[in-house]
Structure formats: C-alpha cells, structure tokens
C-alpha cells in the first residue's frame, strides 16, 4: 500500500545521508510512524538499532505490532518494543519502539548510545517532559560523543521552525492524508457534557458509516457517557491508561459489530483503531498543573489546542473517507491555543534536575532546549533533592542520588525503595502510586495492595513483574514494613494528623489536606499521604495509608523537635508558657510551664508590637494626657508610643501575665522635664474656678478646650478664662448638673442672656442665690441659708 509519506521518503533519506538531523511534518494518516523506521534500515549509515520514541505505551505496542505485521514477522524479531511494564525484543531486533521514559533511562545509562544509529522522536508536538528532555540529552550526546547519530523529530502538527532551529536541520513536509475528511461543527447545547456527547454520538451513528471514536477529557466523563449510551446496538469500548491491555487491544481491533470507543487523549496520536470512520470531539482536555510553591499538582479541564483537535480529527481518515463531529462552532477553532503548553513549564522537575546533575549539567539551562526549565521550579526541585540527600550543597549528585536515579521511579519513590527494609513491599507501593487504577481506586493503599495481590489480569501480572525488578535493582531486603511507614519515607512532609471528624488534616509540611469523612481512613489519627490533588489550601487526598502514633514517633524521632514557647494568647489576653513537641507544623503534645519575669514582660511587649496599641485598655486619664500633648504640640502618637514601649510600658509589666490599663502617669513618664513644662504651660490639666473648684479641661472636645462646671462657680469673674490665647469653651450647668449655656464670652453672657437664665434658675432652685450682676457676686456653690443670705 502506498501512503502519502512515501512521496517524501526520497527527500528525507537524502537529507539524512547528507546531515545527521531532520524535521518531518506529516498530517495524521500519512504513515510516518510505521513507514519511516523500516525505510531507514536500508540506509548505508544505519548499521545499528533504530529507536522510535512514542508518547504512550499503547501507541508504542500498537506501532511495533503494525510494523511487524507489515514485515510478516512476529513482534520481537526485527521489530520490538519496550515499555515500563512490558518488553518484546531479541538479539535480532533492529527497530525498537519505546516510550520516551524508557529512552530517557537508556541514554542516562549509556550516554553514547552504543549500537544505536538513529533516534526518531514521534509526536513531538505533545511536548512531554520526557520527550523534551530526551531530545536535549540526545543533542548533547550527538555533539560531544556521537556526531554521526541521526536524530529525527516527527509530528503531524509540528511547530517546525522552532524544531528546525534547535536541531539545525531542514523541515520536510509530507502531503495530506490518503483519504478525504469532512468536518461538521455541531456546537454544544446547555446540557451536561456527557449528555451533549451522547446526543452527537447518536446523531453520528445515524448519519455516518463506520465505527465511532469519541474524545473526552477524562475517565469520569467516559464512565458517565457510557451510562448514557447503554442499550445502543453497538459494541462499546473504553480507552484510557487504566484500562487493562487486553481491553485496549479489543478497542483497537476491527469488530463484526459496529463499535463506539470512548477515549481520552491516549488515542490522539500514533494509533490506528481499525474500522473508525467517525470522530466525535468534545474539544476538551484535562491537563496537570503544578504549583511550585505548594509542591502539588491539580488537574484542570480546558479547551484542547489546535494541534490536538487536528490530531483527533485525523483519526477518522486513516483507513478511508471520514467525518469528524466537533462540539463547537467552526469560528471558535481559531481561538484555540495553537499547541499544548510544554510539560516542562508546569511540572515537578526533581527527576530532571537529578538526571541533569548526573549527566554533568548542574545547571539544566546549559543544555539545548526548546523551552528551558523555569528557574523557580529548578530551585524547588534542587531543594527537594537535597532534603532527600540526592544532591550535595553545590548541586552535585551524591552516591545516594545516583542510586535513586538508577531506579525507573521519581526521586521520592526511589528514595522510599532504597531506604526501606522491606523493599519488595516498597516496590509494590511504588507501583500502586505509578499506575492509576491498579488494585482499584481506593484512597487506602493497604486495600489496593490486597486487591492487586488477588488480581490475575495481564496488567496486574505485568505490574508484579516490574515491581519485582525494581526491588531486585534496589537490593531486596527482609524485615516487613507497613504501607504507612513506607509511604512516610517517600513523603515525610505529607505525614498528616486528623483535625476534627477526619475531613481536615494538617501535614508536617504545613499544608492542609481534605478527605471524605466517610472514608474508613478518616477514623485514623495519622495518615501517610501519597498523592494529593487540587489547590494548595485543602488539596484532596487521593492515596494514603494509616499510621499509628507509635510509628510516627519511631519513624521521625530525629525530626521531632522540643520547644518551650512563651507568647501572648490574644483570645485570653494572657501570656502562655508551653512546652511543645512538634513534627514540622504538627504539634504532638503541649504542657503548661512557668516563666521568668523578663520573659513575661518580653512576651507582652512583643504582643503590643505585633498587634498594636489596640491590645491596651486606655484610662480616661491617659486619653486626656494624649489630647493635652497633641494640643501642646508634643508627640504622644501611636508611632512614638510603640517605639518607646520599654520606657513607658515595660516598668508596669513586672510580674504580670496580662497587659495593664494605660494610666496618665505611665504616659507622662515618657516626657522629659522640658516637655512636661511645655505641657503644663500650654495645656494645663485643670481650670480652677473662682469658687476654688478644680475641673478637668477636655482638649479633645469639638470646638477647642472645654470645661464643664456649675455657673455659680464663676460668680465674681468678669473676664473670660483662656488657655494661652484661646478662650475656654465653658459648658455651664445648673445646681443639678443640667446644661444651661455654652459660651466663649463670659462677660457678654453675664450682660446678655443671664437675666433670663437667672429668672428660670430662681424658679427652679429658689434656695440658691441668683444675683442680677453675677460678675460682682462672690462665687459660692452653697444655698442662700449656708451663705447667710436667706
């Protein structure tokens, strides 16, 4: 069969004879995945093995099986494959289709790639971390060790110019697919996604011929859509990473009945699903988003990129004329992002930083990247690796770090495996954390481990074999360890203690996690938490195992700190003296204690510095002093009081656990002698009346300094009293203290409205003397009889 890719093969072969690198852009269905590698085998420069890198296990296995079928050979002879869980190769194998992660491990182990003639990076537009890193390592190896090594970047929707600059290579473009493809934009209503998708699937089954491939963002949407399609006269398949391989193969094979395959992005690239002529595309994808500060990943559902929807549509036209139904309007396609964001910009970089250090690139940016790893993420990864003892202070790999890198696991899980005594069980826990759905989807890893032990499917068996290999690599140990203890080795910062009913948990690293209180694990006091997902505040626990308090004490004895804390408790208003035992942010125990006088005083002063003067209860006298100072132009502001706490507040704290009320005397102690003289001169505290009575002057009153007193106390005074040049505001009251007049001009009051006031007062208070000319009368607060007038 002649494929579109065959028209550009001569150009590609000629290019790779003349130079080591090339970039190939070929639309879906052109045949690049299965046609290029066999063609390169015949080239004179190709004396060794060809490595064809695939982004997914399913695609790697399917590509190898298809090429072997075309060659008329069984898989594992000339053409084989290698994935994390499975491998079919032999001494005769010339083409190995492998996942990008397997290639990364291989080139790290053998940087010169002995007996390898070419590395083909397929579907590089997906920009996975392993693909970008593998290409950077291959370019470095080519430049330093293997100048004759051929490197080919291939994709259907490639940003060709950028790859061409990186590889210093020409871009070769293939013609379109062999079959016509119709795009039907049907839009999406207001219903739930699965209802809308099910509606369009039924429409497609009526209008078009052939099997139907449906793209959905995740497993949950696949399950709900399957429920809505139940009862259709079709063969219904689910295709995602957790589906056992036997079921994956069934989804790929042609069936006697019409077939509907519900898939995630696993089916976007490098796969031919026999019989598919129709694609239904939701237009959505679910991507991980990494929070560097929190060290957590959350899944975000977002619009798929133009590159992704092009790949999806191409699935319909691989074996004949096809049609793609899109659940959006045609005009919206231009608004989709051109490509998926590179994974390197939004993921945990611990494994990459460790591998770079071992490679000799302590600064990853020194390698050749399409997009260099973000500086903040590199630093966070370096910190994590130093905590795991994988890197030294200079960023170089330690012996322990090299041992971790030798295992096909992320550094945390590799650390667990190396540090465990029960390495067989540790390898099994690592497998459960690596393979979603293995042993079920329980949060409790103990339950999943038991269920996996009884599973007999192909995936379960392959996982057991892989875990056994990991344990052997680490050097199998003996003494049994519980799952929680093992998990705590990998994620010590996620060891968590229950708060309340089990819905909320506090981790040693200070993060708060959430767990469904109906989960059996919610009854545990402690959890070793593995996977978490969501926002930094309140991320959801996906996998965990129970821990006992005794296990926590045993595992983290060296990390548990003892602390004596003397601090101010704002709720009670008292200084607390506590003895604390802590594991990170978790308080294990607390007890009350005693403190020295200077410690109590220091805690009270610190509380006022932290929370401000609002902690202090102010007396009327203290407020009056501050008002006088402000009137006199002296500084008793909050800023000065806070700056000089030791001078005016500290002396009053001796032996106290609570803050005292602020008195006038405390504030006056802050003023030096010239300031006190200025205060008394410009803002005297009292007004002494002609009757000899003393009255506080209110300097905070509206309108200026004010004095309230009985009008009789001012008899005999014809000149208005002043503070400096400012007349006092006199609030005059009756013998009963009721207000009768406010004045700033006493003389005018006496000669004006006093006559009416006196008339009223004589009626109300006949026992008191109310003279017609009060400025000539003697001031006296007594009744007429006591004055000898009655």
Q: Predicted segments — roles?
A:
Residues 1-416, 702:
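P-loop NTPase motor module signature
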Residues 19, 322, 423-428, 482, ...:
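Active-site lining segments that contact anionic ligands and/or coordinate catalytic metals
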Residues 28, 498-527, 532, 689, ...:
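Segments forming glycine/polar-rich beta-alpha architectures that bind adenosine-containing cofactors
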Residues 77-83, 486, 503, 696:
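Long, charged, glycine-rich C-terminal linkers/tails
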Residues 110-125, 135, 282-286, 295, ...:
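Extended active-site and interfacial segments that coordinate phosphate-rich ligands
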Residues 172-174, 503-508, 567-568, 683-690:
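Short acidic-hydrophobic surface loop/beta-edge motif
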Residues 235-238, 247, 280, 288, ...:
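Second RecA-like catalytic domain
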Residues 574-790:
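Charged, non-catalytic accessory extensions
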């Amino acid at each position: 069969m002649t494929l579109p890719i065959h028209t550009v093969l001569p150009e590609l072969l000629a290019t790779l004879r003349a130079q080591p690198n090339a970039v190939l852009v070929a639309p879906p269905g052109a045949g690049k995945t299965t046609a290029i590698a066999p063609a390169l085998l015949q080239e004179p420069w190709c004396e060794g093995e060809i490595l064809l890198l695939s982004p997914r296990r399913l695609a790697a296995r399917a590509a190898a099986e298809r090429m072997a079928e075309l060659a008329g050979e069984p898989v594992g002879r000339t053409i084989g494959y290698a994935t994390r869980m499975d491998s079919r190769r032999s001494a005769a194998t010339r083409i190995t289709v492998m996942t990008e992660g397997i290639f990364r491990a291989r080139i790290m182990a053998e940087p010169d790639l002995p007996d390898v003639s070419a590395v083909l990076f397929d579907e590089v537009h997906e920009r996975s971390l392993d693909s970008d890193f593998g290409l950077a390592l291959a370019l470095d190896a080519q430049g330093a060790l293997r100048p004759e090594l051929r490197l080919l970047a291939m994709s259907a929707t490639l940003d060709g110019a950028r790859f061409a600059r990186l590889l210093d290579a020409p871009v070769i473009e293939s013609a379109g697919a062999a079959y016509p493809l119709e795009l039907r934009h049907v839009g999406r209503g207001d219903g739930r996604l699965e209802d809308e998708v099910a509606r369009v699937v039924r429409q497609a089954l009526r209008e078009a011929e052939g099997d139907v491939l449906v793209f959905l963002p995740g497993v949950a949407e696949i399950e709900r859509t399957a429920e809505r399609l139940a009862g259709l006269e079709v063969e219904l398949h689910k295709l995602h990473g957790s589906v056992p391989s036997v079921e994956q193969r069934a989804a790929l094979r042609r069936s006697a009945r019409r077939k509907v395959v519900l898939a995630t992005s696993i089916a976007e690239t490098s796969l031919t699903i026999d019989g598919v002529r129709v694609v239904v595309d939701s237009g959505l994808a679910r991507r991980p988003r990494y929070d560097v500060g929190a060290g957590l990943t959350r899944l975000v559902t977002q619009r798929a990129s133009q590159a992704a929807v092009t790949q999806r549509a191409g699935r319909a036209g691989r074996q004949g004329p096809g049609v793609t139904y899109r659940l959006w309007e045609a005009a919206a396609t231009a608004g989709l992002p051109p490509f998926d964001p590179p994974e390197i910009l939004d993921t945990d970089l611990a494994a990459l930083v460790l591998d770079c250090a071992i490679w000799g690139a302590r600064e990853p940016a020194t390698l050749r990247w399409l997009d260099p790893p973000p500086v903040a993420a590199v630093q966070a990864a370096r910190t994590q690796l130093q905590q795991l003892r994988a890197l030294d202070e200079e960023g170089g790999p330690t012996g322990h770090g090299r041992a971790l890198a030798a295992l096909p696991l992320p550094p945390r899980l590799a650390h667990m495996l190396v540090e465990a005594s029960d390495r067989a069980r540790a390898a099994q826990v690592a497998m459960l954390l690596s393979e979603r759905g293995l042993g079920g989807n329980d949060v409790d890893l103990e339950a999943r481990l038991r269920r996996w032990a009884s599973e007999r499917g192909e995936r379960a068996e392959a996982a057991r074999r892989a875990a056994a290999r990991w344990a052997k690599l680490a050097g199998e140990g003996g003494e049994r360890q519980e799952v929680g203890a093992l998990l705590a080795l990998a994620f010590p910062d996620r060891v968590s203690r229950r708060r309340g009913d089990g819905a909320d948990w506090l981790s040693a690293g200070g993060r708060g996690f959430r767990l469904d209180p109906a989960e059996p694990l919610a009854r545990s006091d402690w959890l070793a938490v593995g996977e978490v997902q969501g926002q930094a505040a309140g991320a959801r626990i996906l996998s965990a195992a129970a821990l006992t308090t005794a296990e926590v004490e045993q595992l983290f004895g060296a990390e548990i700190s003892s602390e004596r804390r003397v601090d101010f408790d704002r709720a009670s208003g008292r200084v607390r003296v506590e003895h604390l035992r802590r594991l990170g942010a978790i308080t294990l125990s607390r007890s009350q204690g005693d403190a020295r006088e200077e410690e109590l005083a220091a805690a009270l002063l610190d509380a006022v510095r932290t929370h401000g003067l609002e902690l202090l209860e102010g007396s009327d006298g203290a407020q009056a002093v501050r008002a006088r100072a402000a009137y006199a132009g002296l500084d008793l502001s909050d800023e000065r009081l806070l700056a000089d706490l030791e001078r005016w507040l500290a002396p009053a704290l001796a032996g106290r656990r609570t803050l005292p009320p602020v008195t006038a005397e405390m504030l006056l102690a802050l003023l030096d002698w010239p300031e006190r003289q200025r205060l008394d001169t410009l803002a005297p505290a009292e007004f002494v009346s002609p009757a000899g009575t003393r009255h506080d002057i209110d300097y905070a009153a509206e309108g200026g300094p004010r004095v309230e007193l009985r009008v009789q106390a001012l008899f005999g005074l014809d000149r208005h009293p002043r503070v400096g040049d400012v007349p006092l505001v006199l609030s005059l009251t009756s013998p009963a203290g009721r207000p009768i007049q406010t004045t700033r001009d006493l003389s005018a009051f006496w000669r004006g409205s006093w006559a009416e006031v006196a008339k009223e007062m004589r009626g109300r208070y006949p026992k008191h003397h109310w003279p017609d000319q009060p400025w000539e009368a003697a001031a006296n607060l007594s009744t007429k009889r006591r004055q000898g007038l009655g």
